[in-house]
Each structure stands twice: as structure tokens, then as C-alpha cells.
């Protein structure tokens, strides 16, 4: 390697104080009485930092090496000095503490500094032994650089130095005895809660949490109360930044609301749908309807314990068996679990759940299969009662359950391939292929160019948002069925001022079932919005010539953001009026913080464009229209054992990590393009 390859270092190397590489050592030489060699390791701003390095002096009777830990303004909170008398010491306040009484020329010393900006103190070790503990010389907010410099900063010239002088500086053409210092194995380890973030810091977004905590009462507390929300979020959620305030606020609001539903049970964590008790809930007030959404959203938490235990509670929390009321609602759980695997990369996570997921799949096969090969479901068991096409006791072939079962079969096929059971994998693949054929042949209404519910042998003859769900699982062939997507931009279809409706607005059945009984005949449901936008993201990313793009996706996400407000505050509830945005259960306690949809999964996979892959490769394709935002960043994303950062910076001047779309892996730049678009990286 060469100095030019050291992208994370600032290097100052004048002629009489050069910097060079000598094998593993970074060598700083100095014979200049008026200058010095300097190298700086640039790091993300960090409050709790451990710095380790090896240092070797070429002499012990002259020369000086200063090692400083500085903030973004150049203030040094702490300084380690190898002085000209052979003493290694650390400055704290006006005095120095000794680290090594007499260091020896040519001997290697391993130095470790454990620094806390919050405590204004550092603990220092040499060769594995504690040598000193000192208060910081200067308080700093955070540390951003580690500086190695051959001598102190010069105090002159300064503002008081005369502009015109009639004499030469003393020894201007003379050199000092050559001093050589070498450093190697420099390692910085942040221990901030968000210490793996490369660009953003949680503290910059904590004011959102403070506002959410104070904007209304906290009458129900689960595992993580409001008082612990900021600490929990700093440790668990990816960080997001953009120039559009409402997007940013909603991103952190939805994480803040999600943790309200994490509940301790006797068998581990569970995740609720309602905070209030519901009579029809399973043990621990759990409801199975939105498990798929819970998995898709929770898969992005940095601590995978939450998702693992939530799923374990569902599948083994009933005396070792699945929860009793799990089959009360349709399930795309196996498919969602496989999508979570695409993020965490944990084969053990998948294999632990596989037997239970296969048992669940078999139960649906045994109870909900029609003679024609499709699956039936009552609309209320889809979580979609009072719908335009179904009924609470109508056993119709709906796009929901059939798409779910296809997705589940495909996921189980992949799980069995991973476990080496290719025969079983092939069986699931054939099951999925058969369902795909039936969905395309029997649920596609050619007249309406839409996937619709099949009532016995007759199409329901009404377009509903559930007709987009086949794309949630990438079922339809390309081009043949694309016309369905025209309906999301058609105001007679699903486009409304406050979101995508659950039934087409032109239908005579639209909003005919009354109000206040959870109707799915047209009002906007975030449950459905999440499914439709996930499907749209798949359609735009995975199909060759989509008739929609980032413009339409961003518009619908923007409306989704705007709709999540009630009485001037961020809000997520059950469902809302499509024309005026009024939450139809908005003042009922049951509706507040309703955990029945995704949002941040759409922000991560859609807006920021991170498309998870089972093999751990990285595809980034942000669905932000050109010219909409000049910058945005998604940081501290845990992905297959790595930390990802996605940056878009039109000019390169906002985040200063380069111009255009940039991908960092573990803080290192691995891919870049000048404009928004697809970026790919394989390890």
C-alpha cells in the first residue's frame, strides 16, 4: 500500500518533516525547527471512544510526539506526549500524569485510551496495564479525529506578530537532530449507542423523541416506556436524514410508536397490535392479523433479540406450541420471516423457525383449500371486514390468501434448499408454481385488467387494493398484468387526497357499508397502504419495463406521511377518510398507536432503496425523483453482519463523503455513482 491509499487519513508531510510507510509502520520524521509531520485519523463523531495503537520512537533523548484526540473544531480533549526526555505522559488539566517513566528507543509500546466525552475523562493503558486516569484537558462534545504530530502546535506567528520584520528568524536554515516516531495498528472503537454510524448521530434526532414523549399522556407502558425510548432508539434503529421535515419526523415517530408494542411475556418478548386489551386477542393481548407487517418492520432493529423472541412467542408460546388463535387471520408469516433472513443473514434464525413455519403452512392447506386449487378466506379473517367483494362468512378465493400462500411456499422452498432438503424444496416450488398459474388464470379479470376476488366461479367485478398484493410476492408475469398499476394514479381508481383507497372510487359499492365498523369498502387503511407500496416497490425494482417509477412511489409515500396526523400531531391509527384525512376512530383510545402497518420498512427499501438479498450482496436503488431532494442519508443499518450507510449528496458538500450516491460498508466507501440510480456491491 501507499500513502495515497489512506483515504481516512489527513497527512501533512513537509520536506524536512516527511511522512512515509515502512512496512506496517507509518513513519513520521522531523528535523525542522519550525514545522512538523502530522497525520490525522478521521472518525465519525463519537462520545465514547476507545483508541489503540502501537508506537515506537527511534530515539529517547530528543524530539517529541504528540497524540491528540480532537473535536470538529480542533479542540484537543486529551494529549499523550512522548517527550524529549524519554517520558511518555498524558495531559489532564494543568498537569501531566506519567504513563511510562522512561521509554526506550526501538521498543514497541501498545497504548490504549478509553475516552468519554460525557464524563470528560480518559483511562490510559500501556502494554495491557492501567497507567493513568485523567480528566480531560478541554471538554468536547464529541471526538472526530486522532492526531499524531511531531511536536506542539506553534504559537507564532499570531495576531500580535509584526507584519514587517527586518531580521531573519533564528536558525532559519538550520536543522534539528532527526527525530523518528512510528505508529502502527491504529484502531478506533466507538461504544456510543449509535457508535457504528458512519455519518449521522442519534443525538441530532433526539429532540423528536423528547417532543413525542411530551405531546400526550402515557397511560399504558410495556417493556420500553417513554422514559427509555431515546436510549432504546439510539441502540436499535437505523438513522435517517433528509431535507424534508415531515418525512424525517414521521420516520422517528414510527420507531417511537413501534417500541410501545414490545411487551414482556412469561415466554419472551411479544408484539401487540392494540395497546388496549381486546376480548378476541390471544394470550398476552396478541393478535395475529399483522404479524407479517411486524416482522417486516422489526427486521431492521439492530438487536435481533426482539424479532427472534416475538416469533418464538407466536410459534412456541402456548406451552411449546403455536398460539391458539394464530389461524384466526390470514398469514404471510413464512414469507416475512424469509425477508427478515435477507436482512440478518442468520441461518440459525431461519432453521429454528422452519419446522413451525411448515406446520403452519400445512394447517392452511388442510383447512382452506377449495376444490379448484385456490384458497378461500372470509374478509374479516383477512383483517378486512365489510369489504366490497367479501363477507364475514363468505368463503371466497381472494387475492390475499392466495398470494400469501404462494409467498409462503416460495419462502419454504428456499429454506429447504438452505437446509439441504432439495426434494422438499422442489415440492414447495411446484406448489407455488401451481398457485401462480391459478392466480393468473382465475383471479385476473380481463375486462377490468385487475386481480379480483373470485366468488365461487364468478369475478367479484370490483377492483380492491388487495388486487395489488400479487406483486408483494412478485407473482405476475412481466407486462401481461402491468395495466393494473394505472389504477393507483387514477382518481376514479384508488388515488385520493389522503391516500390509496381500499376499493376503487368509481364502484357503486364504494363507502356503502357505513362508518365506524372497520369498513374495507373504500376508506384508507395503512395496513393496505403498506402492502400496496411494498408491492409497488417490487414492481418498480423487479420488473423490466414498469409503467410507474420513483415519481409515483414518492408521491404516495408523501401522502402517507401527510395522512399520519391527528389534531396537529403525528398519529397512526386504524383507518381514515380518503377526502379529508379524518381518522375514523381517531378519538378512540383503541386506535391510538395502532400497530397494523409498516412505514420504516418502506422508507428503507423504497425511499432509500436498500433491496435486501439472501446472499448478502447489496443493491441500492432509491425511489426519490431526481431534483426532489439534494441530499439524504440512511445510516447504521445492520445487514448480514455489516453496518451500511447510504448517502445521496448532489454536490458532495453536505455530508462530505463524495458527490452523488455513495455506499459505505463498515464506514468504508465501496461504491459510488454521480446520480440517483441503481448501485450494486458484492463482497
Which sequence ranges carry the predicted segments?
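Extracellular glycan-recognition surfaces and repeat-rich motifs
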Residues: 2-25
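Secretory/extracellular carbohydrate-interaction modules
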Residues: 22-88
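Aromatic-rich carbohydrate-recognition surfaces in CAZymes
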Residues: 202-208, 226, 284-379, 383, ...
Amino acid at each position: 500500500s501507499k500513502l495515497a491509499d489512506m483515504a481516512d487519513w489527513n497527512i501533512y508531510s513537509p520536506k524536512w518533516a516527511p511522512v512515509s510507510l515502512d512496512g506496517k509502520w507509518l513513519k513520521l520524521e522531523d528535523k525542522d525547527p519550525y514545522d512538523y509531520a502530522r497525520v490525522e485519523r478521521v472518525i465519525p463523531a463519537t462520545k465514547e471512544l476507545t483508541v489503540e495503537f502501537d508506537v515506537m520512537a527511534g530515539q529517547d533523548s530528543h524530539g517529541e510526539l504528540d497524540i491528540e484526540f480532537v473535536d470538529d473544531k480542533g479542540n484537543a480533549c486529551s494529549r499523550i506526549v512522548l517527550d524529549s526526555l524519554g517520558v511518555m505522559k498524558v495531559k489532564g488539566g494543568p498537569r501531566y500524569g506519567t504513563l511510562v517513566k522512561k521509554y526506550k528507543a526501538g521498543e514497541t509500546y501498545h497504548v490504549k485510551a478509553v475516552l468519554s466525552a460525557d464524563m470528560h475523562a480518559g483511562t490510559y493503558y500501556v502494554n495491557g496495564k492501567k497507567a493513568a486516569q485523567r480528566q480531560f484537558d478541554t471538554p468536547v462534545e464529541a471526538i472526530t479525529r486522532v492526531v499524531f504530530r511531531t511536536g506542539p502546535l506553534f504559537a507564532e506567528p499570531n495576531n500580535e506578530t509584526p507584519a514587517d520584520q527586518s531580521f531573519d528568524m533564528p536558525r532559519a536554515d538550520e536543522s534539528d537532530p532527526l527525530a523518528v516516531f512510528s505508529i502502527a495498528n491504529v484502531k478506533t472503537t466507538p461504544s456510543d449507542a449509535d457508535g457504528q454510524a458512519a455519518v449521522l448521530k442519534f443525538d441530532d434526532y433526539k429532540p423528536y423523541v423528547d417532543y413525542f414523549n411530551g405531546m400526550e399522556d402515557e397511560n399504558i407502558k410495556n417493556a420500553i416506556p417513554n422514559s427509555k425510548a431515546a436510549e432504546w432508539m439510539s441502540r436499535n434503529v437505523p438513522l435517517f436524514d433528509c431535507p424534508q421535515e415531515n418525512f424525517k419526523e414521521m420516520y422517528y415517530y414510527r420507531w417511537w410508536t413501534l417500541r410501545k408494542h414490545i411487551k414482556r411475556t412469561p415466554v419472551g418478548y411479544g408484539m401487540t397490535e392494540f395497546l388496549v386489551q381486546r376480548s378476541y386477542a390471544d394470550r398476552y393481548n396478541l393478535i395475529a392479523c399483522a404479524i407479517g407487517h411486524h416482522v417486516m418492520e422489526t427486521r431492521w432493529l439492530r438487536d435481533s433479540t426482539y424479532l427472534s423472541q416475538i416469533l418464538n412467542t407466536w410459534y412456541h408460546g402456548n406451552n411449546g406450541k403455536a398460539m391458539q388463535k394464530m389461524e384466526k387471520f390470514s398469514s404471510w408469516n413464512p414469507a416475512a420471516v424469509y425477508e427478515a433472513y435477507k436482512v440478518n443473514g442468520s441461518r440459525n434464525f431461519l432453521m429454528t423457525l422452519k419446522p413451525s413455519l411448515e406446520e403452519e403452512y400445512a394447517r392452511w392447506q388442510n383447512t382452506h383449500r377449495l376444490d379448484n386449487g385456490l384458497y378461500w378466506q372470509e374478509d374479516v379473517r383477512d383483517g378486512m371486514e365489510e369489504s366490497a367483494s367479501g363477507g364475514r362468512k363468505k368463503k371466497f378465493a381472494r387475492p390475499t390468501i392466495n398470494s400469501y400462500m404462494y409467498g409462503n411456499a416460495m419462502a419454504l422452498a428456499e429454506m429447504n434448499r438452505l437446509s439441504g432438503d432439495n426434494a422438499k424444496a422442489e415440492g414447495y416450488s411446484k406448489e407455488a408454481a401451481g398457485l401462480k398459474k391459478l392466480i393468473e388464470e382465475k383471479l385476473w379479470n380481463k375486462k377490468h385488467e385487475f386481480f379480483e376476488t373470485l366468488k365461487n366461479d364468478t369475478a367479484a367485478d370490483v377492483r380492491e387494493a388487495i388486487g395489488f398484493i400479487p406483486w408483494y410476492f412478485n407473482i405476475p408475469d412481466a407486462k401481461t398484468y402491468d395495466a393494473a398499476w394505472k389504477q393507483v394514479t387514477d382518481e376514479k381508481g384508488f388515488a385520493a387526497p389522503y391516500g390509496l383507497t381500499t376499493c376503487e372510487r368509481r364502484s357503486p359499492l364504494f363507502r356503502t357499508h357505513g362508518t365506524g365498523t372497520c369498513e374495507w369498502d373504500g376508506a384508507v387503511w395503512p395496513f393496505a397502504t403498506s402492502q400496496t407500496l411494498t408491492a409497488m416497490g417490487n414492481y418498480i425494482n423487479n420488473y423490466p419495463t414498469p409503467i410507474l417509477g420513483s415519481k409515483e412511489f414518492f408521491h404516495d409515500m408523501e401522502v402517507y406521511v401527510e395522512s399520519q396526523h391527528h389534531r396537529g400531531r403525528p398519529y397512526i391509527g386504524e383507518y381514515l377518510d380518503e377526502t379529508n384525512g379524518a381518522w375514523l376512530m381517531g378519538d378512540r383510545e383503541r386506535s391510538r398507536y395502532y400497530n397494523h402497518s409498516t412505514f420504516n420498512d418502506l422508507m428503507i427499501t423504497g425511499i432509500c432503496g436498500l433491496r435486501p438479498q439472501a446472499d448478502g450482496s447489496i443493491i441500492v436503488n432509491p425511489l426519490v425523483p431526481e431534483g426532489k431532494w439534494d441530499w439524504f442519508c440512511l445510516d447504521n443499518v445492520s445487514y448480514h453482519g455489516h453496518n451500511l450507510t447510504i448517502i445521496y449528496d448532489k454536490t458532495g458538500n453536505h455530508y462530505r463523503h463524495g458527490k452523488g450516491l455513495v455506499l459505505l460498508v463498515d464506514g468504508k466507501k465501496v461504491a459510488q455513482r454521480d446520480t440517483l440510480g441503481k448501485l450494486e456491491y458484492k463482497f
